[in-house]
Amino acid sequence: MNFFSVRTYRFLRALVLGIFRIIHPKVVVSGRENIPEGACILSSNHSAFSDPIWLVGYANLPTMPRVMAKQELTKVPVISWFCKKLGCIFVNRDGNDLVAIKTAMKTLREGEKLVVFPEGTRVRDGKPSEPHIGAVLLAARTRCPIVPAYVTMHKKLFRAIHVVIGRPYYPKASAKPSPEELEAGTTQLMKTIYGLGEGLQ
């Protein structure tokens, strides 16, 4: 759970987006209506540090979702403090982080929304590099839908930012998915995410 009240979260969202709109005055959002009530996994491409801000900010969620973030951010002074205040779930990407997985599952089962970037870190060329299976695993284990999303990859100054939110779906995987199911589901997820951005760059 994040430490900010709903009121504070909404104030900070408006403040940060206002600042970002100075360098990107035009933001085009589509598919916001696809986000279901209750628990779901918002899963997007990741090409810049600002992606969580564009995605969470323009999804216009009533409360702050929890975001899965790489553990390396805990070593960055200001960002580390802010991420902790927002209730981010830090993940060790070098192996199976059972603590992070259990925390994420608990979050979803309590009806909260979760943001997961399958690529695990910024990918600048638009081609996923060994995406992680976490989003599909969590969806399979909790039976929560995945909501694919795409955020403009090449964020040039004063150019439009597109945030495209796709329809929710349940990956084809059993409650205790095999490695093959997880790999296939993750491949399909990345195809869906990048498919949302076709023709937008």
Model-derived segments and spans:
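A transmembrane-helix-recognition feature enriched in membrane-embedded lipid enzymes
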Residues: 1-30, 77-86
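Short, basic, glycine/proline-bearing loop/turn elements
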Residues: 16, 85-90, 118-121
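Short, flexible loop segments at the rims of nucleotide/cofactor-binding pockets, characterized by
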Residues: 17-23, 90-94, 124-126
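A generic structural signal for well-ordered alpha-helical segments
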Residues: 20, 60, 82-83, 107, ...
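Glycine-rich, highly charged phosphate/nucleotide-binding loops
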Residues: 26-28, 96-100
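Flexible, charged surface loops at secondary-structure boundaries
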Residues: 34-37, 109
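Catalytic core of membrane glycerolipid acyltransferases/transacylases, capturing the structured
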Residues: 36-95
